[in-house]
UniProtKB/Swiss-Prot annotation:
Leader peptide range in chain numbering: none
Gene that specifies this protein: SBE2
Natural source organism: Kluyveromyces lactis (strain ATCC 8585 / CBS 2359 / DSM 70799 / NBRC 1267 / NRRL Y-1140 / WM37) (Yeast)
Compositional bias (Low complexity): 20-36, 60-74
Compositional bias ranges of the Polar residues kind: 75-85, 125-136, 170-186, 264-291
Lineage per the UniProt record: Eukaryota, Fungi, Dikarya, Ascomycota, Saccharomycotina
Location of region: Disordered: 1-151, 169-188, 264-311
Any single Gene Ontology cellular-component annotation: Golgi apparatus
Name listed for the protein in its UniProt record: Protein SBE2
Chain coiled-coil ranges: none
Record-linked Pfam families: SBE2_C, SBE2_M, SBE2_N
Domain of life: Eukaryota
Amino acid sequence: MVAARPRKAGTYPTTAQVPSSANASSISSYTNSSNSKTVGSGITRRPSENMLLNMAEGKQSQNQNQQQQQQQHQTHNPRSSANGSEESDHVLSFKPPNRKAVLIKNERPISNDSINTEGDVFSINAGSSKDSSRGTSIIDDDDDENHDTEQSAVLDGKVSANVMPRGKKSFSSVKQNPVTPHSSVTDGLDDVSHLTDTSFSDADLSVTTVKVASAPKSMNTKYIFNNPGSQGKSVAPDAFQSVDSSPKLTRSMFSTVNPTAMHSSYDQHSQLHGQSQPLHNTHPLATSLHSKSVPALPSDSLNGKKPLTPSQRYRLRREQNKLHLQHSIKQKELFYDEDAKLPANDLLDESLVWSIPTASHSSTFISQRKHRASVPNVGRSAKLLDGHDMPPSPIPGVQKVSDLEYFQQVGKNLSAVYQKSEYEVTKSKLLERTQSAELLPLDFKNASVEGMEDLKLVSDDKVSIISSTRPCWLPPKDTEERRSHERDVRKTLSMASIEKLETNQRRHEQEIKNETNNQKLVLLIDRGLNRKSSLQDLKKIAWETGFSSARRSFIYNTVLNTDFNIISTKYMDDTSSLDNIIRSKMTPFPSTQMAEINKLVDDMHFPVESQIRSKLIKLLQWKSISRFGLQTGDNYLMLHFLLEGYDLELIWKLANLLQLTCFNSITRDKYDNRIMNRDGVVGRYMRKDSAFAEEFDSRYLNYMTFWNCLARVDHDLFIWIMDIIVAENARASRWTEEWQHQLRNTDWDTFKEKYIVVNYKVLCSLSLNVLLRYHFGWNNLLHLDELPPSFQLVKPVDNREPVSDQYLVFIKKWNHYYAKF
């Protein structure tokens, strides 16, 4: 290592102080570490560094002469280049300009109005704004287009170009008119102050100074600083040239220079660079050109412009960093775009890719290859698709169709898909509801029959909210109300179902009892009905089921007429004798009596057929001329027996037996007296309710009104009532032939008082049952005779329930009140 010489004040050491290898390495390291700060941006410099350009201009002509001499000397004697370092070992002794004179009128501005705007500071000319907005510079654009070389050209009649490979340092200048060193340095400093368009890249750093149109004519110097090197290369001696600049350069001017001149200049420069390599290491400016004392932006005091303030320098540095970042992003985007491209043969068929989101037709960067003019054949793929499904469609942006046509077809296809799916869903829903219509509740079916509901339009949601307690065409109930009503309905239905089960059970049991009692009757007849034990069973059977039609006449005759037929043979008239009297003596039949008979038949509340009517009239004629004459109830007894199908002889016999035993005069008198007894059973029940106060009267409660009750019951119930009355009027006795001889001379009144049972209680209990349980639609028993013939005391609740159940209920209630007597 050679020790550095001490240098005087105001002087700069030459390159001879440092060896060539060390000098080259120092220049390279300095270039890599701080060149981006000193040359590119013009910041972080000391004031003394501004002297470099002044000294460089002073030695411009001398350097050119030395370069020519060195070239000639190397041509004749290549070995003489070794002494060049000793000849150039001298000190630059130019005095720097007076700093006080420069900064007299360049104080820092005190307001924002005096500060240059960003547009003034950061733009060289009007043409550079477009490049700055894109984050690029003239040199950057030139680098993007060429990628291998860097070119700098100035046009002013003569063109000089310095083209070097990437990684070299170059500084070129084209000179038009010779000027003094001092003036050229001054002009250069003035022009350097207009440096604004500066670009950074990863490989190079360039500073370009162009003459502003408003500058004076004398300041026509242009400096181009190219510092791309980070490879340790030295600067060529001819890299610093001062020329007179022609008009402003633009991006197009760089690319439109004379190719011949540029190639020739490039060849000359290459030869010169190769010959001057040893001299470069010993040149006085080789080490001082890129020293830390060299300013990138000289002071603007010479041309009357203010220097950059710290804030302006900060804004300049921030703008340069932003441009550098934009340039880096652009380079990376281009890299990834290149990497993302696919070969032309690897692209898929557009007809098979239709559901992938794509860009609009204006995006031409999607594909670089030329597409086919014809539309791809999709016939083969279309055969596999449904006509209503989404057909294949071209990728937007790569087919020769407009956006409107593409989206119209897509809209039609989507509409067709939606309409078809909607039609299929509707069809399936209607089919499902049609098949499930039979499973809907009865409320919907009844409403459909009435025209209030369409079963096809009943959905599951409607079925879930519709309640059976309200018609389906009305608004649905509230949730709580529906739950409460459904709970009550379930309770009522459960009770009704229980009652229905009980009714069915009772009906079944009644049928069993009916069969059992019929068999018991056969046994009782065989054993004898007038026995005391037999009569108890007979009464029980009468209250439970009644007598059968086949054995009813026999039971009546045996119980009421005794085993020897005493009443019918001794106290009743013979029908043959009565018929002879009518034919012999009463032809024609007396009109007064006949009118009375017709009235009895007409007042009956039963429809009477003509055949039954003639028989009934004949029976009534016999009864009218008989010993006891016509009595209350004869017409009803004879009519119901006729309905049973008995012959006239049997009917005559049974009707007279009932009138002489069950409804005789003693029974009628006791009925009238007991029913009006206020202390009796009927009186006590009627006094409990004040509504019966008016009805408790002899006009309404008598034997005549009793038959009004029997006239308002059905035939089956009437016969059942007669069975009970006959059974309750039966008497247990053993009739013998001796008793028969003793009764031969006994009249009817004596026989009645001695051997006939008088049971008025069964009749009074029947009237009480009607008054208390079936008092509906009439005011009193006398009013019953005035009601229409269709009125019945006991009738079925509905048509689905058999009336026999109501008859059974009537008999049970009657038995209940009969037990009170």
